[in-house]
């Protein structure tokens, strides 16, 4: 398989019969480089993901009186499955997870379809700006969104009279806020490439606009809608920070229950069972998402010969188009813009409504119960996110480079598919499980006398684990679109494997790599689940500080949390606006 990945140069340019030895040396070098490209990410994932997660889960399944490390302990007690699954609370949490994810998915699709039509099928001045506004919520840190909607629904907020604070409705609305752009971008990008002639033919035959939509347009959009719905369900089912802030003790998901069981009750058996249960749910959802995505790709391939996309202006929308425009305007202004605007306004006012900058001045004061200020936490967040982004881009870039190869053998193709799937696992495992697994595993690992939990690299490594799948999905489509004959031609002309990568692959992935850096940085900046376990008191990140502030009573603490959330939102949005400028035509969509 390795010789297929990097064809060795023939060496026919070498004089005096040295071609074979030179070609053999270059072939050996190529194989060594490809082995390293697989081994380095594999070792990273094994040490910093598979080992901690397996240790965490196995520790929960060890017998209660077992004192040895669970990986090597013969004392097993799988009765924890029956005990935990027999608790009414467990099934209540599972039911709430599916209920919240189901409601969030349905509402996101229903509201996102009109937005996809307006923003991708129609054209108007400022459309690119509106698209950017729609995209920003998806990359905002979860604690920022949680604080923003909490400030809307709490008693002193604009919607406090509705009694929705810490309710199921508040959670679902926040989930739609996050995932609206997933539907708009996934369905809209597909819709923009649909051939308009079938719709025109149906209208010419007398079909009403509603019937055209029902019998022609929606069936054609079905693969994209299914793909978007599966992704939204996945994001809703694994939501953590937003649900933890808005749900309180009444509402939660499997993800938040793992956190509660681990931090408040030290019930590792329950946390382990719930982690396995979440893995099963996520695996099923990702399988459905993969099938739907494959259908969407095949449908796009069939559209390849269709005429170029034809966007219509907003004039002459008709009743259906006008309704889509109205729904989109209400969603963008009311659901996306208003919560963040309210967050900014509330951060500039006192509890009695007076305008002030005191909340921002408080960012320079130590947070209650800590010697760290919010500004210091912001600096820590920027530094750790930068390190995490570098790690994620290096590891994720190597994975994408290897997976993009096209081996001739079926075994080679299956091996690369397996490698791709393994590096997607961090998407399906609770960040809480990863974080606590770090604490358990790195406490003098393998009998070493060094406690690695005090290392300053622990937080960025955990954040990088979460960001690697995003880097892979951003860069991989570009590498797969590269014609392999270009690499083969360069190798035939005598270029070594490293030079082939530098002169053929790298120039094409520079812009997508910039986008991947932005995504990795933004994800790491707002990561909360694993960081909540690993951040030391003197090096807390800004999301951790915000969560601590809203957990303390007093209007001053909440006002400081609002100001800190605004700072975090502005930094994240700025990073993503810059990163989006690096997007190429074939860069992956998240």
Predicted regions: what is each one?
Residues 30-67, 82-192, 220-241, 245-247, ...:
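Membrane-water interface segments at the C-terminal ends of transmembrane alpha-helices
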């Amino acid at each position: 398989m390795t010789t297929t990945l990097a064809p060795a140069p023939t060496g026919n340019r070498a004089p005096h019969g040295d071609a074979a030895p030179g070609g053999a040396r270059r072939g050996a070098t190529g194989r060594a480089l490809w082995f390293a490209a697989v081994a380095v990410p594999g070792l990273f994932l094994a040490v910093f993901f598979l080992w901690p997660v397996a240790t965490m889960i196995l520790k929960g399944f060890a017998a209660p009186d077992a004192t040895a490390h669970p990986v090597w302990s013969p004392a097993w007690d799988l009765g924890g499955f029956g005990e935990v699954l027999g608790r009414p609370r467990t099934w209540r949490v599972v039911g709430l997870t599916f209920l919240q994810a189901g409601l969030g998915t349905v509402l996101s699709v229903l509201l996102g379809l009109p937005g996809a039509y307006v923003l991708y099928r129609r054209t108007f001045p400022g459309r690119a700006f509106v698209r950017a506004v729609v995209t920003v919520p998806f990359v905002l840190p979860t604690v920022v969104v949680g604080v923003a909607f909490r400030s809307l629904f709490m008693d002193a907020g604009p919607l406090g009279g509705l009694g929705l604070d810490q309710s199921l409705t508040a959670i679902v609305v926040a989930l739609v806020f996050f995932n609206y752009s997933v539907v708009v971008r996934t369905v809209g990008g597909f819709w923009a490439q649909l051939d308009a002639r079938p719709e025109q033919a149906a209208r010419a035959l007398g079909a009403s606009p509603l019937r055209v939509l029902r019998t022609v347009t929606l069936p054609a959009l079905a693969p994209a809608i299914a793909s978007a719905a599966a992704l939204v369900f996945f994001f809703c089912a694994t939501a953590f920070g937003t649900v933890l802030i808005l749900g309180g003790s009444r509402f939660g998901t499997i993800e938040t229950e793992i956190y509660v069981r681990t931090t408040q009750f030290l019930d590792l058996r329950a946390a382990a069972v719930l982690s396995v249960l979440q893995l099963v749910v996520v695996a099923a959802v990702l399988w459905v998402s993969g099938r739907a995505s494959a259908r969407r790709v095949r449908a796009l391939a069939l559209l390849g010969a269709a005429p170029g996309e034809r966007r219509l202006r907003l004039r002459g929308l008709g009743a259906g188009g006008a309704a889509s425009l109205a729904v989109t305007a209400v969603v963008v202004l009311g659901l996306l813009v208003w919560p963040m605007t309210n967050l900014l306004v509330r951060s500039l006012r006192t509890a009695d409504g007076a305008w002030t900058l005191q909340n921002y001045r408080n960012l320079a004061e130590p947070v209650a119960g800590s010697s760290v200020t919010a500004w210091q936490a912001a600096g820590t967040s920027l530094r750790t996110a930068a390190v995490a982004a570098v790690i994620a881009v290096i590891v994720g870039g190597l994975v994408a480079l290897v997976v993009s190869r096209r081996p001739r053998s079926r075994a080679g193709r299956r091996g690369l598919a397996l490698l791709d799937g393994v590096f997607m696992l961090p998407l399906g495992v609770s960040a809480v499980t990863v974080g606590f697994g770090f604490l358990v595993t790195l406490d003098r690992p393998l009998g070493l006398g060094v406690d690695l939990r005090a290392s300053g690299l622990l937080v960025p490594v955990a954040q990088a684990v979460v960001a690697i799948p995003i880097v892979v999905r951003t860069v991989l489509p570009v590498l797969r679109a590269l014609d392999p004959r270009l690499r083969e031609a360069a190798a035939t002309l005598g270029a070594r494997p490293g030079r082939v990568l530098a002169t053929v692959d790298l120039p094409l992935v520079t812009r997508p790599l910039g986008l991947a850096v932005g995504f990795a940085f933004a994800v790491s900046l707002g990561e909360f689940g694993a960081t909540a376990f690993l951040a030391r008191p003197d090096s807390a990140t800004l999301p951790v500080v915000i969560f601590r502030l809203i957990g303390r009573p007093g209007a001053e603490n909440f006002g400081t949390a609002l100001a800190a959330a605004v700072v975090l939102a502005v930094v994240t949005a700025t990073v993503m606006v810059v990163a989006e400028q690096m997007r190429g035509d074939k860069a992956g969509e998240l």
